[in-house]
């Protein structure tokens, strides 16, 4: 079975109950299955809290955080520091052998600047799988922040969904986008079991899929096309379903290529 990339998002990093559910599921899964797991995370809520404390403006365009040069250090500290080490501490608590990384380690993901207007915001492309494969084969679960670096040595804030997609591409792995939403909802608030490009474009055009969810859906669609396999969007709230989810059973919205 191919490795599985699990992207953790939403309020999960700021919610002890959520972390407990996810790491309990990861521990149970690792005890009963041999599938290799990679965790990728952002930490938007942590960044927002830090920015507010420092009285710095929070600006987003189409779900992507505008990152001026004077803020990239703060965001790097929040994501590659606080968020990453928080998850590593939970992994230790649940006896999960883990290693904390950022996208530049071993050139796991190749990153370039997305645009001058967004500042230090990076575009993620597949990189070198050697380091990840070495860690996975040794029994470790890599926990990777969405901070990257360009070939000029400039730190970049990468959308975590897109970072997870690039890592799945690098490894030829399956991808699950795990957050506080159970999947994509239709206009009546009902979960959509599966969705393709055409259906997604219709929902975006009608304003049903908006803001950060557009980035999430586009990242999942891009991953599904690139990997030529389905990608799942699901919630951590349904802890009893997570083991099935990690085994490839759809429990949220399945994104079709």
Swiss-Prot record:
Site (Transition state stabilizer): 7, 216
Function in brief: Catalyzes the ATP-dependent phosphorylation of N-acetyl-L-glutamate.
Family annotation (InterPro entries): AceGlu_kinase-like_sf (IPR036393), AcgluKinase_fam (IPR004662), ArgB (IPR037528), Asp/Glu/Uridylate_kinase (IPR001048), NAGK-NC (IPR041731)
Keywords: Amino-acid biosynthesis, Arginine biosynthesis, ATP-binding, Cytoplasm, Kinase, Nucleotide-binding, Transferase
GO cellular component terms attached to this protein's record: cytoplasm
Enzyme class: transferase
Localization, UniProt: Cytoplasm
Record EC number: 2.7.2.8
SUPFAM superfamilies in the record: Carbamate kinase-like (SSF53633)
Domain of life: Bacteria
Quaternary structure and interacting proteins, as annotated: Homodimer.
Name of the protein in its database record: Acetylglutamate kinase
Source organism of this protein record: Photorhabdus laumondii subsp. laumondii (strain DSM 15139 / CIP 105565 / TT01) (Photorhabdus luminescens subsp. laumondii)
């Amino acid at each position: 079975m191919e490795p599985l990339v699990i992207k953790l998002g939403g309020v999960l990093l700021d919610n002890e109950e959520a972390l407990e559910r996810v790491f309990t599921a990861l521990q149970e899964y690792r005890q009963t299955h041999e599938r290799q797991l990679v965790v990728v995370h952002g930490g938007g809520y942590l960044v927002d809290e830090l920015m507010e404390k420092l009285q710095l403006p929070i600006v987003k365009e189409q779900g992507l955080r505008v990152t001026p040069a004077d803020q990239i250090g703060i965001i790097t500290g929040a994501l590659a520091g606080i968020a990453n080490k928080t998850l590593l501490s939970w992994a230790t608590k649940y006896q999960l052998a883990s290693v904390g990384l950022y996208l530049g380690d071993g050139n796991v993901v190749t990153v370039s600047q997305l645009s001058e207007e967004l500042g230090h915001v990076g575009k993620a492309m597949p990189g070198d799988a050697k380091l990840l494969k070495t860690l996975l084969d040794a029994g470790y679960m890599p926990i990777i922040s969405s901070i990257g670096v360009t070939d000029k040595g400039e730190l970049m804030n990468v959308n975590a969904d897109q970072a997870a997609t690039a890592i799945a591409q690098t490894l030829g792995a399956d991808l699950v986008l795990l957050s506080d939403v159970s999947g994509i909802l239709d206009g009546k608030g009902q979960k959509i079991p599966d969705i393709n490009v055409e259906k997604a474009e219709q929902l975006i055009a009608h304003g049903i899929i908006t803001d950060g969810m557009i980035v999430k859906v586009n990242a999942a669609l891009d991953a599904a096309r690139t990997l030529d396999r389905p990608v799942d969007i699901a919630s951590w709230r349904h802890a009893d379903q997570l083991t099935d989810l990690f085994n490839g059973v759809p429990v949220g919205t399945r994104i079709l290529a």
